[in-house]
Design a protein with these regions (language model features):
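Short, surface-exposed acidic
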Residues: 1-6, 13-16, 83-93, 180-185
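Metal-dependent phosphoesterase signature
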Residues: 2-40
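A conserved alpha-helical element in kinase catalytic cores
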Residues: 207-231
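C-terminal cap/substrate-recognition subdomain and adjoining C-terminal extension
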Residues: 63-169
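Juxta-kinase regulatory segment immediately upstream of eukaryotic protein kinase catalytic domains
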Residues: 163-186
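ATP-binding glycine-rich phosphate-binding loop
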Residues: 178-201
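Short, glycine/serine-rich, charged loops/turns that create anion-binding
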Residues: 56, 120, 141, 203, ...
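Substrate-recognition element of Asp-dependent hydrolases with the DxDx(T/V) motif
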Residues: 26, 35-76, 97
Length: 231
């Protein structure tokens, strides 16, 4: 973003790109690693999740006039945000704001305990509610921001807000990947930053589940390497 905006006509180019990415090509977007697990862990703890987005109805310079808000909701629907058997987020808990000021008012109105954003400008506003704890997502210098937690992965965000991963978390995540109900889960020794669990289903089938370090912060292809070794 910053690189584009520094170029000649950079602001216009950036706005055009935003219109394409969040409009016509929104269907191709994927969730960040760790987001799905975070939402599932919020659900089993009965935490309410709100999505408050500063998003205009249409992209700038978009001749097709594709509704960015409608595309965002369609994408969330596809990713099962509103499915009560999955993330279970209430569709009414999604808010779109025309301006940053409107976004800040909505955050204050909802009395959020935490708010996560990847734009520093949101937290630098004097009108940001003082009772809401801030998490800035990304790689920023902590000393540049007052009273703001800076984290660069959703696993770290989950640990900050929800605490350490529990067996119930692991069971919930595994249930979304497997067709068989889980009977028992046991943590066994893991090496380094990896965590290994033994899972038994109700039909007595046994599986190993391994949780690797986040690829966002650790680029080593550990899963691929181990899989190739086993072949």
């Amino acid at each position: 973003r910053d690189h584009l905006r520094c170029q000649p006509n950079g602001e216009k180019t950036w706005m055009k790109l935003q219109g394409l990415v969040y409009g016509k090509h929104m269907h191709g977007a994927e969730m960040m690693p760790g987001v799905a697990n975070f939402f599932l862990s919020c659900k089993i703890r009965n935490h309410r999740v709100f999505i408050v987005s500063h998003k205009t109805e249409y992209g700038h310079y978009d001749p097709e006039k594709i509704s960015l808000r409608r595309e965002a909701l369609k994408w969330m629907e596809t990713k099962r945000f509103f499915d009560p058997e999955y993330f279970g987020i209430n569709r009414k808990n999604v808010y779109f704001a025309d301006t940053r000021e409107e976004k800040l008012k909505k955050i204050a109105q909802l009395k959020c305990d935490w708010f996560i954003d990847d734009l520093p400008e949101v937290f630098e506003e004097n009108r940001f509610p003082s009772d809401t704890k801030k998490i800035l997502f990304g790689s920023y210098e902590p000393e540049l921001f007052h009273n703001t937690t800076i984290l660069n992965s959703w696993r770290k965000i989950s640990e900050k807000i929800l605490g350490q991963t529990t067996d119930k978390d692991i069971t919930t995540w595994a249930n979304r990947m497997m067709e068989k109900p889980i009977h028992h889960i046991e943590k066994i020794a893991g090496r380094g930053n990896s965590k290994v669990y033994k899972i038994k289903t109700t039909s007595e089938d046994a599986y190993a589940l391994k949780q690797y370090p986040n690829l966002v912060t650790d680029k080593r292809p550990r899963l691929t390497t181990e899989f190739n070794t086993l072949q």
